[in-house]
Amino acid sequence: MRNEFRTLRLKQLDRILKPFRAAAKNPRPPKGWLRAIREAAGISASEVARVLKTSRGLPVQLEKAEAEDRITLKSLRAAANALGCDLVYALVPKGETLRELVEERARAQAKRQVLSVEHSMALEDQAVGRVDEAVEAETKRRLRKRGIE
């Protein structure tokens, strides 16, 4: 991606992901969304199987696979559709924003580089000190290089 568009893209993605942040804070039901929604709506596994045009045991297998994090997106989408739901998913940064994620990665890379150089210089009795300032400067350089101001 061209550097001049990277900052704009980060802002756009952060705006798109904002509603998902609140959803990410709510845990999945212990037995999964499929089972929770099916039971709450009073829909039998047989009804789901009929809509999916499959065996009666498959909906229960899908519910178990979802609860165990083994279900595919394709299967989850089909099961959601059979329940009259849409599958909505997103990758949500663990921090507040995607930009913070990028900055943290750049800072970690800069710190590794600066500490490596500082260590080499210390071995040669030329240590400069001020590691924090060097890390911050290197972080800013890396972000500028990626087109992020």
Question: Language-model segments: which ranges?
Answer:
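DNA major-groove recognition helix of helix-turn-helix/homeodomain DNA-binding modules
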Residues: 73-89
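Short basic helix-loop element that most often maps to the first helix and adjoining turn
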Residues: 2-3, 32-51
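Helix-turn-helix/winged-helix DNA-binding modules
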Residues: 29, 40, 68-71
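Short C-terminal boundary/hinge segments that cap the last helix of small helical domains
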Residues: 84-100
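N-terminal flexible/basic segments that precede or flank functional cores
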Residues: 1-29, 97-149
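Short, contiguous strand/loop micro-motifs
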Residues: 20-22, 32, 62-66
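Recognition helix of helix-turn-helix/homeodomain-like DNA-binding domains
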Residues: 52-70
